[in-house]
């Protein structure tokens, strides 16, 4: 059996800790034969555990402690610590692993709830489970979210080789915002969401670049954001914004500009991969 979970981008600018979008990069987990102990082969390196302390296995065992150990093979196209939901993908893969092997028959809603409890909020895990675009909130321990189709557009991901830990990126954020600034930040997010629902990417893109919640603080850790935004906008893109906590920058553009933008971004003197992606519509899947 095979489990496949997509990458996700969170925030989309002003939709801080609320908006998430599934992308066509994947964590793939092949479930092999039963074994005496858990072992997971993977292509990540960097000290990621191979035993039951691995997040995937740990998550599965928290849900189903009596699972029979298996040999697992993980292939992950989602680079860690780049703002593309790698940890959320691992958590969701663990939930799917337990659900499959223990026949838990979890609903998608239950999967989102469990994953959001582990991750703290639903912005990455909800689109990883459900696919497409999700707007969510966690209030008094309860998850509220809406899944909707994202407008058709090209997505160009500028993924630096250097990592940026979420904890470091969150560390530069202020504890509070002045009331008037928070009201303005909220109104910007509201207009962005309304524009997306109306398939108006031009207006949505303008709002994406006017975030007041987090990007101006995180830009000190991601100095290439302004440079990429200038290049993208000069060539007709809708917007460029941080993917999650960064350092990845995601460019939204008309499809006919995708290749030109990719080429232009590849010429920047920053060590990075520049990938053409799409919105992933299905979310986590199990292939039997």
Swiss-Prot record:
Its EC number is 2.7.1.39. The keyword Nucleus does not apply. It holds the Pfam family GHMP_kinases_N. It catalyses: L-homoserine + ATP = O-phospho-L-homoserine + ADP + H(+). GO terms for biological process: threonine biosynthetic process. It is found in: Cytoplasm. It is an enzyme of class 2 (transferase). Pathway: Amino-acid biosynthesis; L-threonine biosynthesis; L-threonine from L-aspartate: step 4/5. ATP binds at residues 79-89. Keywords: Amino-acid biosynthesis, ATP-binding, Cytoplasm, Kinase, Nucleotide-binding, Threonine biosynthesis, Transferase. One of its GO terms (cellular component) is cytoplasm. SUPFAM superfamilies: GHMP Kinase, C-terminal domain (SSF55060), Ribosomal protein S5 domain 2-like (SSF54211). Gene3D superfamilies: 3.30.230.10, GHMP kinase, C-terminal domain. One of its GO terms (molecular function) is ATP binding. PANTHER family: HOMOSERINE KINASE, HOMOSERINE/4-DIPHOSPHOCYTIDYL-2-C-METHYL-D-ERYTHRITOL KINASE. Belongs to the GHMP kinase family. Homoserine kinase subfamily. Catalyzes the ATP-dependent phosphorylation of L-homoserine to L-homoserine phosphate. This is Homoserine kinase. The gene is thrB.
């Amino acid at each position: 059996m095979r489990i496949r979970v997509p990458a996700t981008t969170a925030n989309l600018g002003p939709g801080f800790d609320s908006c998430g979008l599934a992308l066509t990069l994947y964590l793939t987990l092949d479930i092999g034969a039963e074994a005496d102990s858990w072992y997971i082969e993977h292509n990540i390196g960097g000290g990621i555990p191979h035993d039951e302390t691995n997040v995937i296995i740990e998550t599965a065992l928290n849900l189903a402690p009596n699972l029979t150990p298996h040999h697992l093979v993980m292939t992950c196209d989602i680079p860690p610590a780049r703002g593309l939901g790698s940890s959320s993908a691992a958590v969701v893969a663990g939930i799917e692993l337990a659900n499959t092997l223990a026949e838990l028959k979890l609903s998608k809603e239950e999967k989102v709830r469990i994953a959001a409890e582990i991750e703290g909020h639903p912005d990455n895990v909800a689109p990883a489970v459900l696919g497409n675009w999700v707007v969510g909130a966690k209030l008094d321990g309860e998850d509220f979210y809406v899944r909707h189709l994202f407008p058709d557009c090209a997505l160009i991901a500028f993924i630096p080789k250097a990592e940026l830990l979420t904890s470091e990126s969150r560390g530069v954020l202020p504890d509070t915002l002045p009331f008037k600034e928070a009201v303005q930040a909220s109104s910007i997010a509201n207009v962005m969401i309304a524009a997306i629902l109306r398939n108006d990417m031009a207006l949505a893109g303008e709002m994406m670049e006017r975030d007041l919640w987090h990007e101006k603080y995180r830009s000190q850790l991601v100095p290439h954001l302004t440079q990429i935004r200038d290049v993208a906008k000069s060539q007709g893109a809708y917007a460029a914004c941080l993917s999650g906590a960064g350092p990845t920058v995601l460019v939204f553009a008309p499809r006919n500009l995708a290749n030109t933008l990719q080429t232009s971004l590849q010429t920047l003197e920053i060590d990075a991969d520049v990938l053409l992606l799409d919105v992933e519509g299905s979310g986590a899947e199990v292939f039997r």
